[in-house]
Amino acid sequence: MENLRRQFDLPTEDQLFLNDYGLPWETTVDGSHWVLIHNFATDERYNHPKVTAAIRLEAGYPRAGLDMVYFFPALVRTDGKPINRTEGTQIIANQTFQRWSRHRTSQNPWIIGQDNIGTHIVLIEDWLAREFER
């Protein structure tokens, strides 16, 4: 991809993780600070094998935790079963992203100094896979 936006700087550890992750990524400011990860692999049981995943960085990140994920284009299961808590949408850079309302739990809280974009992406990958366990 060409012309990847870098509208704000990420902490060094996040930049290193994203570069090593190997997918095109960018940062953009559109009401909030967003990290967009392109060509993000889903699962063959979704309607799109690759999407753009968006992560909103809350004010105070990395002390403030990351939450949820947004996908473009929107995902549906190919077996026709609904995906719970995905009804919300968010316009980011003139595209309508599907919000996946997923949250950390008291058993898996955000830990300052340990959690970052990399650990959040691991959760996103897990959310995509676990969708088919229900």
Which stretches of residues belong to each language-model region?
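Domain-scale recognition of soluble eukaryotic interaction modules
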Residues: E2-N3, G65-R134
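Proline-anchored loop/turn motifs at beta-strand termini and strand-loop-strand connectors
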Residues: A54-P62
